[in-house]
């Protein structure tokens, strides 16, 4: 089961609504669902909450180290409570996924994401779960730094919030250790709305009788 849920972002009001803080938004939603409150914990360099799920302690963490040093916070809590990498899930913004979509995976590269890069280094392993929350790509690599530190458009914000709400429905499966089910739930999007029935074709007039012409 997942014992440590981490959301990545940058601390402070200047960053609250930026794309890079999508991971924080996800943890905020999970905290609401579990009815716990995040509080500052200096020992773990972040905002922390503890939930009890079926007699098991589960931790929620928002590192307050700024993105590039996220691993310092994650490793501090994980090592103290002897949580293994495969028992950790990190929710983060993902450039290569469109707004409105999210993907769940275990392991793999950090793909240039500086928060993941530091978690890799501090844990000494890439073998943790990632919930990749789509924020879209600006289309030009040189614009990425500005893109992630800006607020999404209202339409994109709604799409991101929708994907967060949808992926949070997989949290019970994550807590139960059924990651196959969790993956299926995250990756299964809402079915398209059925198309309205086509109007019935207008009746074809019968040909006039010879005597009627």
Curated annotation (Swiss-Prot):
EC number(s) recorded for this UniProt protein: 3.1.1.29
Alphabetized InterPro entries for the sequence: Pept_tRNA_hydro, Pept_tRNA_hydro_CS, Pept_tRNA_hydro_sf
Region (Disordered): 187-213
Active site (UniProt): 20 (proton acceptor)
GO cellular component term of the entry, any: cytoplasm
Subcellular compartments: Cytoplasm
Keywords associated with the record: Cytoplasm, Hydrolase, RNA-binding, tRNA-binding
Residues the record marks as site: Discriminates between blocked and unblocked aminoacyl-tRNA: 10
Site (Stabilizes the basic form of H active site to accept a proton): 93
Chief subcellular location: cytoplasm
GO biological process: protein quality control for misfolded or incompletely synthesized proteins; rescue of stalled ribosome
Low complexity: compositionally biased ranges: 201-213
Catalyzed reactions per annotation: an N-acyl-L-alpha-aminoacyl-tRNA + H2O = an N-acyl-L-amino acid + a tRNA + H(+)
Residues that bind tRNA: 15, 66, 68, 114
SUPFAM superfamilies to which the protein is assigned, alphabetical: Peptidyl-tRNA hydrolase-like
Family in the record: Belongs to the PTH family.
Subunit composition and interactions: Monomer.
Protein's name in the database: Peptidyl-tRNA hydrolase
Organism this protein belongs to: Paracidovorax citrulli (strain AAC00-1)
């Amino acid at each position: 089961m997942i014992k440590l849920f981490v959301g990545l972002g940058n601390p402070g009001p200047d960053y609250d609504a930026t794309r890079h803080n999508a991971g924080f938004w996800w943890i905020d939603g999970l905290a609401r669902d579990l009815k716990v409150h995040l509080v500052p914990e200096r020992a773990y360099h972040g905002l922390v909450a503890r939930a009890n799920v079926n007699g098991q302690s589960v931790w929620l963490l928002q590192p307050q180290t700024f993105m590039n040093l996220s691993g310092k916070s994650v490793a501090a809590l994980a090592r103290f409570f002897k949580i293994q990498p495969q028992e950790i899930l990190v929710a983060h913004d993902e450039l290569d996924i469109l707004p409105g979509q999210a993907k769940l995976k275990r392991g793999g590269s950090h793909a240039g994401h500086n928060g993941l890069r530091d978690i890799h280094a501090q844990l000494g392993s890439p073998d943790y779960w990632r919930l990749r929350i789509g924020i879209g790509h600006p289309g030009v690599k040189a614009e990425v730094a500005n893109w992630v530190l800006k607020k999404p458009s209202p339409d994109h914000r709604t799409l991101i919030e929708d994907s967060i709400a949808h992926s949070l429905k997989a949290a019970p499966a994550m807590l139960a250790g059924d990651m196959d089910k969790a993956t299926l739930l995250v990756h299964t999007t809402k079915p398209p709305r059925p198309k309205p029935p086509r109007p019935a074709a207008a009746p074809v007039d019968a040909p006039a009788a010879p005597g009627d012409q």
